[in-house]
UniProtKB/Swiss-Prot annotation:
Cofactor(s) the protein requires to work: [2Fe-2S] cluster
InterPro entries, per database record: TR_Rrf2-type_CS, Tscrpt_reg_Rrf2, WH-like_DNA-bd_sf, WH_DNA-bd_sf
Entry protein name: HTH-type transcriptional regulator NsrR
Top-level taxon in the UniProt lineage: Bacteria
Pfam families from the UniProt entry: Rrf2
Limits of the HTH rrf2-type domain: 2-133
Chain sites annotated for binding [2Fe-2S] cluster: 92, 100, 106
Keywords of the record: 2Fe-2S, DNA-binding, Iron, Iron-sulfur, Metal-binding, Transcription, Transcription regulation
Gene3D superfamilies associated with the record: Winged helix-like DNA-binding domain superfamily/Winged helix DNA-binding domain
Species of origin: Halalkalibacterium halodurans (strain ATCC BAA-125 / DSM 18197 / FERM 7344 / JCM 9153 / C-125)
A single Gene Ontology CC term: cytosol
Function: Nitric oxide-responsive transcriptional regulator.
Amino acid sequence: MQLTSYTDYSLRLLLYLALQPKDKLSSVKQVATIYNISYNHLTKVTYELGKLGLIETIKGRNGGIRLAKAPEEINIGAVVKQTEDNLELVECFNHETNTCILNPVCRLKGVLHEALTAYLRVLEQYTLKDLLTNEDELQALLKLKP
């Protein structure tokens, strides 16, 4: 299963913010530049993560963004489920658009559903804090430490 760039950027933004001092504000432009990703796309991601209560956005001249929750309170599986617009691996997962003639007897759908459930279950075992065990290396790569 491949995550969308939207989810990828969401996770990267959360990781970046988790590496910052608790009260430090970052800018979307700064994060987009560091990751070499679209500012406009990251702005949409930022807006959505704010609506989900994962990041805090402060408007104004001295505004910026920061985590709204502690890293240990942000579950990776939950973020993926909230930011992926479609977790249907195959057409038959959607009863409204399914046109596969094998559907009544197909066993593949069950196997794929089991695989998706296992995939999400693994992601749900981790929090943002779990991704920070190599904090020094991450900060060096993101040029957060001199």
